Structures are given as structure tokens and as C-alpha cells.
């Protein structure tokens, strides 16, 4: 197979892999945007070409099996390449790859992002996808149909996680691997699951507080923090912790 690619690791025989090529493509695009050095754009395009010609599938999968973090990283890489070059092929792919993660049953369970595993890296996958999905939603040049779908899906996932958090246990309030069920107290808490849950709530909050989201036609609730009282609120306005006043 001809083209520029990176191996999964340094072991002999390690071949090209979406988990290295996707972030490499994204990083090269970001470096070009930062420094304007043409070689970075050349690398980004070559990584994109290898991914689309040899690894990504025509139905929207970035790899087999499809994993949320590579759907997100390669989708974000495509979005940035569109803004750099103005070429519509990148815009089209960005929408297809990120939308797949939220709408296809290979990445979802009962309409929510699925449980992808309990290891430290697997439990972090959704933490990678979420900010890139929100970036897509807030990008006025991306397809409005995909943006509307993603805004709704992100809110649905955030609502499910919030419903299943044991808020009475705060601050020992742990996120589950799958947001459609409560954290199992018989199991050790996962920092990866916590990172994914925090990424979801933080980035949905960012999405809800941005004016461009309103242009999608989707109403998004948001509760601004009360900086004077120090109170801590949830996205739906529930008081989590009473602040102290001096």
C-alpha cells in the first residue's frame, strides 16, 4: 500500500492504524494553522489520503471496529482541513464521521454512546470524541442537518448521565462507563469514565452557552454559575453545593 502512514507502535511488523493516523492528521493540520509551514499541510493531506483510501469505510466508519475517539479525531481533522483548503470533500467527511459515532448502532446502545471497555484507554474514548462533536455543532460552516442531529444527541447523552449521577453522594459522585445506567458502587471508580463524563457535561455546557447553537433551531438550557455566591449548579439549575460568603 502506497502512501504516508504511521505504525500503531514501534514493534516490528506494526502497520498503519487509525489510532495513530487520525490524531497525526489532526495535529499536522493544527501545526499548519499555527505556523503556516507548508510541510505540515502536506503531511495532513497525505495522512488524510491514506486514511480514506486504505482504512476508513464508505459507510462512515473510520476503522473496524468503529471507536468513538477515532471517529472524533479524524472528523475534527477533516473539519480543519476544510477550513484550511476550502475543499468540500473535507467538510463532507467531517460530518459523516462524527455523525456516525452518535447515530450508528456500532457506536451506540439504546440511543446513547456505548460502553467501550473498562481499561484506562477504552474508558477515555468518549472524552476525546465529545469536544470535537461540539466543535462541529458550533461551526456555522458545517452542515445544518448534521449539526441539529448532533446537538440533540449530545443533549440526550448529557441528560442521561445527569439523571444517573448520584448527586446525594457529592463529592463522591462517580460517572458510569455507560451513561444510560447508574454507577455500580460495587466496582472501583474509573478515572477514565470520570474524564469522559466530565468531558460530556463541560462541553455540552460550552455548546449551550454559545450563540451559534441557537441557529440550529434547537433550544438548549443552560444555567450560568453564580460567581457572587459561590453556589455550584447543574446544567438544569439544580443547586449542587451551597457557596460560602465571607
Listing of model-derived features with the role each one plays in the protein:
Residues 16, 96-213:
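CBM-like carbohydrate-recognition segments
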